[in-house]
C-alpha cells in the first residue's frame, strides 16, 4: 500500500437513538469523536416493520403531505 493516501482509521463512540453506546473503528471524525444517530436499526421502519413514525425533520413530510395529500392514490 502507498503511504500517505489512506484516511486515518481510529476509534469513535456511536450513540444509538435509545441511548445505548458502543465503540467502533471509523474514518469519520477524529479519535474519540461521538456520532449521535438520528435513525438506526431500532427506529427505522425497514427493521421495525413500519410500526414507528419517521421524524419530520424540518417539516419536509408535512410539506409533502400538504402538497400531494389530496391525490388519493
UniProtKB/Swiss-Prot annotation:
| Any one GO biological process | translation
What Gene3D superfamilies does UniProt report for this protein, alphabetically? Answer: Ribosomal protein L31
Q: Which GO terms describe its molecular function?
A: rRNA binding; structural constituent of ribosome
Q: Does the keyword Endoplasmic reticulum apply?
A: no
Q: Which GO terms describe its cellular component?
A: ribonucleoprotein complex; ribosome
User: Is Nucleotide-binding among this UniProt entry's keywords?
Assistant: no
* Keywords on record: Ribonucleoprotein, Ribosomal protein, RNA-binding, rRNA-binding
Q: Which InterPro entries match?
A: Ribosomal_bL28/bL31-like_sf (IPR034704), Ribosomal_bL31 (IPR002150), Ribosomal_bL31_A (IPR027491), Ribosomal_bL31_sf (IPR042105)
Q: State the function annotated in the UniProt record.
A: Binds the 23S rRNA.
Q: Which family does the similarity line name?
A: Belongs to the bacterial ribosomal protein bL31 family. Type A subfamily.
What is annotated about its quaternary structure and interactions? Answer: Part of the 50S ribosomal subunit.
This chain belongs to the protein called Large ribosomal subunit protein bL31
Amino acid at each position: 500500500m502507498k503511504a500517505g493516501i489512506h484516511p486515518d482509521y481510529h476509534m469513535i463512540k456511536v450513540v444509538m437513538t435509545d441511548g445505548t453506546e458502543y465503540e467502533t473503528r471509523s474514518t469519520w471524525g477524529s479519535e474519540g469523536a461521538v456520532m449521535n444517530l438520528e435513525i438506526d436499526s431500532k427506529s427505522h421502519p425497514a427493521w421495525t416493520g413500519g410500526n414507528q413514525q419517521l421524524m419530520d425533520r424540518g417539516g419536509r413530510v408535512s410539506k409533502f403531505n400538504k402538497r400531494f395529500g389530496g391525490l388519493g392514490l
